[in-house]
Amino acid sequence: MENNLIVIENGQLNIYLLDNQVVWEVGRMSKEHTPDIPMHATTISRRHGRFQNMDGIWFYMDENPKNGTIRNQKKLSSGLHGRVKPVMVSPGDVFVFGGGKDAVVSPATVWAFFRTRYYDAPWRAMDSRGYSKFLIVDGDTRTKLANPEPGSVVECEHGMVIYMGALTYVIGPLKVMGSKGSTDGTNSYRTN
């Protein structure tokens, strides 16, 4: 099992292999502070939170940052009397750091995805501006994605696709085609 965190900020995708250390601090970089998972958005606190392995199980601890953290579309809250409250992390968990009360993926926030499967292959970025529908081909399997929200993830047998609006990230031998759709209900897909 390769626990890893995929982090996307301002079009940049980074992967952190969490099993390489026990604690990973999340925060905004400054002259005096370099967290393990550095972020640049001003909505991120210097000491925003941390991922920590406790007895083989991964947890996220939010340090009660000003602009908060969203996990799976729910704002994380502090524990009793403002204490840090560990939240067990599961494969497929989506985090939005610095988004306030809303889980909005935007240039002011940082998106992250926790997974236990690691691909030792390069990611490809595809220009997806203007596309409202996608066809993802993984061997004989076809998956349709219509009107996705930024931060949508499709995991396939041989790879995965992350839709972020203007850019879509692809890993593995998948073929991804985009369509702008039409008013008559037909679709013309273009391969990127």
Question: Which positions does each model-derived feature cover?
Answer:
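C-terminal boundary/linker segments immediately following FHA domains
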Residues: 2-9, 14, 26, 57-59, ...
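Short coil-to-beta-strand transition motifs
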Residues: 41-46
